[in-house]
Amino acid sequence: MILLIILLPLVGFLLCALFSRYMGRVGSAVLTTMIMFVNVILTLILFYKVSVLRRLYFINIGTWIYSDSFQVNWSFYIDNLTITMLLVVNIVSALVHLYSTDYMSHDPHLPRFMSYLSLFTFFMLMLVTGDNFVILFLGWEGVGLCSYLLISFWYTRLQANKAAIKALVVNRVADFALTIWMVSIFFVFKSLDFHVVFPLAPFLLIPRLFFLVLIYLY
């Protein structure tokens, strides 16, 4: 169910991007919106299991990068914080899909807009469910890309293009800071996995903590 929740928006994006000419504007909008509301229902079920039944979920799909002491897995972790963010992201995204279906009903490029929304949602879900900083970084990069695509959707408007470029530049600054922070965390903990870093953080030696603070301030 967890992988289904994460991947459904990506499926909506692919269907809308590849078959919109056959489904038409209305069909593409209805399909992506229905997928998001199905995702909300699945997330509510998962929310009950995590928050009420007190279950935690860890999924490791496989190893992506492996080199000596550096290893990155395609892994996802669901706890109370994660499921709360999942619920917020999916509900807000479903409502935005629904609103856009009516608000942009007369736009000939509606399928493209809906596909961007679905892709944005997929990367956001990846960001909040990933169990390591690399997956979080990939999700962040995807969110930045989709933000650019959505802001510059009406690419013939000069102001839209300027705003999109500004958003892209701001995201690149954050990328630089996040990259330095990831390198610093690996230097201290020898791992980028959340389930390794978080339990060790309270036992961090003061000099290393000071080093991380300096990196952050820089």
Language model features with spans:
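...captures the hydrophobic TM-helix bundle architecture rather than a specific catalytic motif
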Residues: 1-218
